[in-house]
Amino acid sequence: MLPDHPEMLAHRDMLSSMRASRGLFADAADRQRLSPACARAMRNIFREWRVPRHQAAAVLGVSLYTLNRIQNDNWRGCFSQDQLTRASLTLGIYGSLHSVFDQVLADQWIGLANSGPLFRGKRPIEFMISEGILGMYSVRRHLESLVQGY
């Protein structure tokens, strides 16, 4: 983990304040309603990114068994608050990638080694897996800064 990286510190503070309140996706009825659409979106994004299933499962915070059921359109469950947060971040990352890069690079970027200060040679997918939700927030914020031209 990169505890003193400014983006990680900012996201840690944001998560702490979210936990103090009910936070995103806290309502069970909302999670039940959103889960089917999120499952379809995750299935499509991970296919476009050509992410191995074990990595897709780790990013989404589900077991490989659950991910296989999602990929085969045979899952009727309900994502947890954590899993919906991960799905939301993944959707944001996907959208930002397609705003910044052409179709091919947008779908390859997640698996390419990145020498930038945030990633330090890691592939973004590896960074998100190793750093969890905080890492996913950092990737999304990084990409949003590219969209905005910073």
Give the positions of each predicted feature.
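Non-transmembrane "mature" sequence context
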Residues: 1-150
